[in-house]
A protein has these predicted regions:
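Carbohydrate-associated surface elements
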Residues: 124, 142
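Membrane-proximal helix-turn-helix segments that form the acceptor-binding/catalytic region
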Residues: 71-74, 99-117
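Conserved donor-binding/catalytic core segment of Leloir-type glycosyltransferases
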Residues: 4, 154-182, 195
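A charged, aromatic-enriched C-terminal amphipathic alpha-helix characteristic of glycosyltransferases
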Residues: 308-339
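Conserved acidic donor-binding segment of nucleotide-sugar-dependent glycosyltransferases
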Residues: 285-295, 302-308
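Acidic anion/phosphate-binding donor-loop and adjacent secondary structure
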Residues: 143-159, 343
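Nucleotide-activated donor-binding/catalytic signature segment of Leloir-type glycosyltransferases, i.e.
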Residues: 198-200, 206-240
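Nucleotide-sugar-dependent
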Residues: 172, 228-237, 242-264, 274-282
Length: 343
């Protein structure tokens, strides 16, 4: 089976939903699948698509979106679109205006509607997709734990450290824990630390840092900023702390996301404090769930701080997550789905 994956650039989506699983498929099932990649596909290359049994992409194909879809349909070349996010963006999203101007919502819906199959991350998002296409395969996110970024030694620390890893789309989520961080810093003084991971210069990140800093103008001594890293290196962040924070507003946009932060924390055997909202609702003995109030977040952080067996809680997350998000097992389902569409 000869497969072509199309993507533009290498962001987190491409890395987790296409590059990582397809790399392992090629390594583990070389006798059954040949994976080719194009990161800058042009319409001049349309005739070359005939040599492939299956074409894969995530969400959208760029400026040649409809021409490529039309060519695939005309020549009966099956394709799978992978959907990892809800296609209706909240108005505060940084690319909301761009989505509207370029009609990306409709382009994504059409990609789903005409696809031979759709892959996605969760049952919640799969139910949204089924409005347009019934042939949906849930393939949860999973890490390739043989990658170096998930195998590094933890940083030596002398105080309990909480950390958050994320991007500029999570500004509202960070606000949920702002007061709790301020209370923790006041309560424990220099015996606690918070690490903000992924920082880049710019007004949106400055807003996130302000909130993460407990809305204090001067950077607190307990708050550390770790600059952005590449997608094949950012796993290093999880070496820097003892407890991962996963605050999330209860919105449909967020409900359609995956539990990737819990999966990443599990790679380093870390416990997690997460908002009690989808997609974080699955029972996990290594995750402390909390409602989204400052008092509840402060209480959850204090409870985790005082936890005598913190390492055991983290190991529970690791064991639980490794069973559900095992890349080898998920890739067997992925390969079977590919074969089904190539008959």
């Amino acid at each position: 089976m000869k497969v072509l994956a199309l993507w533009q650039g290498m962001g987190g989506v491409e890395y987790h939903r296409l590059y990582t699983p397809l790399k392992r498929l090629q390594i583990d099932h070389a006798e059954e699948i040949e994976v080719n990649v194009s990161q800058d596909f042009q319409k001049a290359g349309l005739p070359e698509l005939k040599q492939y049994d299956l074409v894969l992409f995530n969400r959208d194909l760029g400026e040649n979106h409809y021409e490529i879809l039309h060519y695939l349909a005309k020549h009966e070349i099956p394709y799978i679109v992978d959907i990892d996010d809800y296609w209706v963006l909240p108005k505060f999203h940084p690319v909301y205006k761009y989505y509207r101007e370029h009609k990306l919502k409709q382009r994504i819906i059409d990609a789903i509607r005409y696809a031979d199959g759709v892959t996605t991350t969760t049952d919640f998002l799969a139910n949204e997709i089924r409005q347009y296409n019934q042939n949906v395969q849930v393939l949860p996110n999973a890490l390739d734990l043989t990658d170096e970024q998930w195998l590094l030694e933890p940083q030596q620390r002398d105080v309990i450290t909480f950390g958050w890893v994320g991007g500029i789309t999570h500004s509202n989520d960070i606000m949920l824990i702002s007061d709790a961080i301020a209370q923790m810093c006041d309560y424990y003084g220099d015996k606690v630390r918070f690490v903000l991971c992924g920082y880049q210069p710019g007004s949106m990140w400055e807003s996130i840092l302000y909130k993460f800093n407990g809305c204090a103008e001067k950077l607190r001594s307990q708050v550390v900023v770790a600059p952005s890293q590449n997608v094949n290196e950012y796993g290093n962040f999880y070496r820097l702390f003892d407890v991962a924070l996963a605050p999330l507003e209860n919105t449909k946009w967020n409900n359609c996301k995956s539990e990737l932060k819990i999966i990443e924390a599990a790679a380093y055997g870390l416990p997690v404090i997460a908002s009690e909202v989808a997609p974080y609702l699955s029972i996990n003995p290594g995750v402390k769930f909390t409602v989204n109030t400052p008092e509840a977040w402060f209480a959850a952080m204090r409870q985790m701080y005082e936890q005598a067996d913190l390492k055991i809680v983290g190991e529970n997350n690791q064991k639980h997550t490794n069973k559900i998000h095992d890349l080898t097992t998920i890739n067997q389902k992925r390969l079977a789905f590919f074969k089904q569409l190539c008959k």
